[in-house]
C-alpha cells in the first residue's frame, strides 16, 4: 500500500495509529470516512506500519476484526516487507493470525529478504507452532527459500532440538527432504544431525533424503553426528547406506570428531563400520592420537582395539568375518524391524521361523545391500538342521553371521546376569553420613509470611546517584529528597551468614534492631560469629561481640567460634575471643580442642598463644590422639618442637598417678531447660526464638483515649521525620585502605580466585609435595 508522503496524509495516518493504540473506534471510523480515501491502508513514513500492523502486534483481536470490517487490507506490507500476518506470527499471536487467515490473507507473500510467514514461526513455543499450523492450512509454501538460498525447512532444522514438532509437520506437509543452503552447501539432514534429533533424521531419510551429500567444507552428516556424540543418528545414517568414512577439507573423518569429544561408543561404531583408522588430519594426527591428547582413555582404548583387529585382517589370506555389507544389512534390519516383522509374519510357519527361500525373497525385494547369494549364505548360517528354516528373532540379533562385538546389542550398558561370576570381596562398610541441616519447618516464620528469620533483609542506600554517592554524601537528611521521586526497590533477603561473610554491617545492624537474635543459626547450625571467625573478618567479630554474641555457642559438631578462629589461623581473633570469655579447652563432637585446630592449620603463633594461656595439650580426642600426635600427623617441626618443649617442662607425676587429662564436659550453651510437653521444634534444633513486638493500632479506641487524657492532642508537634536517612558508607579511600589491610592480613594472594585459608593451603601443599615425591 501507499506510504504517506504529504504532511496532511502523515498527520492523518499518525492520528489513526494513535487511535488504534487507544482503541478509539469512533474516531477511527470518523477518520476513514472523512479523511483521505483508503486511509486505513496507508502506512506511516518511517517504519511503514499500518493500522492493521499495530492491532496485530498488540494481539487486539477486537480491533483487528474492526479494521478488517472497515476495509483494511490484510496483505499491506511495511518497509521490511512484512505483512500483519508475519508480525502476528513472529510474536505468536495465534488469535490475530487466525482472524487474518479467515480474511484471506495471502500466506505466500515474502518480505524484502524473501522470507515467507513460516520463517516467523520458527520459535520454541506452542503458540508459534499453532501459528505455523494456521499458515500451512491456508496455503503457506513449505518449500519457501530466502533470496540467499536458505529453505524454510533447513532453517527449522537449524533449531530442530527446540522446534521438533514444526520440523516434523513440515515434512508431513511435503517439505523437500533434500533442502540445501546454496551458500554453504548444508542440507537439512546435516542440520538435524548436528542438533541430534533422531525423529527428524529418520523422517528425512525415509522420504528419500540424500544421505551422502556434503557441504562446501566436505562435511558429511556423519561428521556432525559424531561431533555431538549422537550414536543413534550414526546408526541411522549407516543403515541408510551412509558413508561414515568421508574425509573433510581439514582432513578430519567422523572418527576424528568422535575422538575429540571422547565418545567411546561412537568411536567403536565408526571404527567397525569402515572408517580409516590410520588417516591423519592436517595436524598430522590420527583419531587415536586425538583421543589420547584429549585425555579420553575409553575412546582411545576402543580405537586401539579396532586397530589391532584391522592389523590382523591385513595379513595375507585373512578373511573378514564382518564384511561391510553384512554390517549394513544388520543395522538396516534393526532399524526396519517392525516393517520386516510384518512381512515375515505372513510367511511364518507357526514356530517363529520362515523357510530359507522365503527369507531370501523378502529381503531381496526390500534392500540393495546384499545379493541373493549373500542372503542365502546368511540363511544357511541360521538353519540348525536341513530345512529347519530361519528363526526371525535370531536374525534380528545378528550373532549368527556377525561377531558379538559388532552387533548393535553389544553397545550400551551391559546387564549383569544373576549367579554368574565370582563374588567380589566385600568392601569396608561405610555408614552414609548425610549433610546435617535444620529442616525448614523447624524455623519460625515471620508474621507476614516472609522467609525464615535467618534470611535477613539486605540494606542499601536508595538515592539519586547523579547527586549523591559514597564520596559525596548529603550534608543533612533534608538535603536528600530523592525519596520523593525514586521508587523503593523490592526487599531482598539473604542468608545472615552470607551477609556476615561479606562484611555488610549495615544489614546486620538493621536485622538486630528489628528483633533478630545476634546468635541466629542458619540451616547449617552456624551463627554469624562462627562465620566471621572462619572468614577472618575481625571488624565483624568486634561488632557481633559488642552486640552480645555468645562466644561459647556451638554448632552441630560442637565447634565454638574459637574452633573456627583457630582453624582459620587468625591470631588476633583468637585473642579477642579469649578476652571475651571463650573457653580455651572446649571439646567438639570428637573431643578436639581449639588447640588441635590451630595445629592443623600449622599456625605457630596461635599454638604458642594457646599454650601460654594454659591450653591443655595432654587432652586426647576420641581416636586417642593428643596434641603431639596431631602435630606429627601434620608434620610441622616447629610446632612439634614447641609441644615437646612444653612436655619436657612438665612436672613429673607421682608413680600412682597417670598422666591423662580428663575430657572437659560438653557445654550447654542454650537457654534453660524446657518441659517436653512445651518443647518446640525451634528449641530442639537450637534455633533462638525471635520476638516481634505487638504493634499498637493507631485507630484503637483505648489508645486514642489515653492520648486525649494525657494532653497529647493539645501539643503542637513540629518534628520533621525524613522518609529515608542516608546510611554512612565507606568512601573510596576507605575501601582502598580496607583492601590494603586485607592484603596485609591474608597476603597479596587474597585478591586471586584461588586464595585458600591456612588449613586448606597447608593440606594442598602437603598433597602436592607428596604427589611430586611419588612421581620421582
Swiss-Prot record:
Keywords: ANK repeat, Repeat. The keyword RNA-binding does not apply. The keyword Zinc does not apply. InterPro entries: Ankyrin-EF-hand (IPR052801), Ankyrin_rpt (IPR002110), Ankyrin_rpt-contain_sf (IPR036770), EF-hand-dom_pair (IPR011992), EF_hand_dom (IPR002048). ANK repeats lie at residues 47-76, 184-213, 217-246, 250-279, 524-553, 557-586, 590-619, 623-652. One of its GO terms (molecular function) is calcium ion binding. PANTHER family: ANKYRIN REPEAT AND EF-HAND DOMAIN-CONTAINING PROTEIN 1 (PTHR24127:SF1). This is Ankyrin repeat and EF-hand domain-containing protein 1. It comes from Homo sapiens.
